[in-house]
Amino acid sequence: MPPSNDDLEGARIMVKLDDLLYARRMTLTELADRVGLTLANLSILKTGKAKAIRFSTLAAICRELDCQPGDLLGYKAD
């Protein structure tokens, strides 16, 4: 049985997009253009406010940043 929302309270997925962009010397605007997302949607992801991400979006970001999903996302339990 999957964990309930109560079991996950305090746990969160961390998005490490800032670190990857800095390492690649790429702006958020440039990445948005390359992956076909609006700057607003990519900003929501970058700030950790996104509730979900499509695999196709994740794949496009990883393609452009030359990284693996685990380089972009992390899990933190409280």
Model regions and ranges:
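The alpha-helix within a helix-turn-helix
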Residues: 21, 32, 62
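DNA major-groove recognition helix of helix-turn-helix/homeodomain DNA-binding modules
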Residues: 56-71
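Short alpha-helical DNA-recognition segment
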Residues: 25-44
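DNA major-groove recognition helix of helix-turn-helix
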Residues: 46, 57, 76
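Residue at a beta-strand N-cap/secondary-structure junction
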Residues: 25, 52-55
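A short, Lys/Arg-rich alpha-helix, primarily the initiator
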Residues: 1-27
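Short amphipathic recognition helices of helix-turn-helix/homeodomain-type DNA-binding modules
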Residues: 71-78
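Short alpha-helical elements of helix-turn-helix
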Residues: 13-15, 54-58
